Swiss-Prot record:
<dbReference type="InterPro" id="IPR009315">
    <property type="entry name" value="P_starv_induced_PsiE"/>
</dbReference>
<keyword id="KW-1133">Transmembrane helix</keyword>
<feature type="transmembrane region" description="Helical">
    <location>
        <begin position="54"/>
        <end position="74"/>
    </location>
</feature>
<feature type="transmembrane region" description="Helical">
    <location>
        <begin position="107"/>
        <end position="127"/>
    </location>
</feature>
<keyword id="KW-0812">Transmembrane</keyword>
<feature type="transmembrane region" description="Helical">
    <location>
        <begin position="20"/>
        <end position="40"/>
    </location>
</feature>
<dbReference type="InterPro" id="IPR020948">
    <property type="entry name" value="P_starv_induced_PsiE-like"/>
</dbReference>
<keyword id="KW-1003">Cell membrane</keyword>
<keyword id="KW-0997">Cell inner membrane</keyword>
<protein>
    <recommendedName>
        <fullName>Protein PsiE homolog</fullName>
    </recommendedName>
</protein>
<dbReference type="Pfam" id="PF06146">
    <property type="entry name" value="PsiE"/>
</dbReference>
<keyword id="KW-0472">Membrane</keyword>
<dbReference type="GO" id="GO:0016036">
    <property type="term" value="P:cellular response to phosphate starvation"/>
</dbReference>
<dbReference type="GO" id="GO:0005886">
    <property type="term" value="C:plasma membrane"/>
</dbReference>
<feature type="transmembrane region" description="Helical">
    <location>
        <begin position="82"/>
        <end position="102"/>
    </location>
</feature>
<comment type="similarity">
    <text>Belongs to the PsiE family.</text>
</comment>
Length: 135
């Protein structure tokens, strides 16, 4: 009986700890997002043309990764302490696209990465069908 009365208290405190941790993570990600914005500005206006296009594209994709993680944390609080699966899939697709942009020397690896993106897109489609949709 004593165990059952403590369970809600433990769950409530663990939820608070998780919320504080996610708020701190969001603050850190916002700092990184600002730093990436400054870096993108430097690459755009101060770098030479040859290297700046690759650095700019890579920076933009990294920027979107930070943005997606912050959006995931916001959605967690908006949806009643639940992480929607589709946001993780978006982050995975963006991360693999960044990997293809940065490391595209081996054609077999690029093909495998592209296949991974296809699998994630199919998963996203299946997760958004009416039978599986929760939100």
């Amino acid at each position: 009986m004593a165990k059952n009365s403590r369970s809600p208290w433990i769950a409530k405190n663990l939820q608070r700890l998780l919320n504080v941790g996610l708020i701190m993570l969001a603050a850190i990600l916002v700092v990184f997002l600002v730093k990436e914005t400054i870096h993108l500005g430097k690459v755009l206006f101060l770098s030479n043309q040859e290297t700046s296009s690759y650095m700019l594209i890579e920076g933009i994709v990294i920027y979107f990764l930070y943005f997606e993680f912050i959006a995931l944390i916001v959605k967690y609080f908006e949806s009643g302490y639940h992480f929607p699966l589709r946001y993780f899939i978006y982050i995975g697709i963006t991360a693999i696209i960044r990997l293809i942009i940065v490391d595209h020397e081996n054609p077999i690896d690029t093909l495998i990465y592209s296949g991974s993106i296809l699998v994630l897109v199919v998963t996203l489609y299946l997760a958004n069908t009416e039978r599986l949709k929760r939100e």
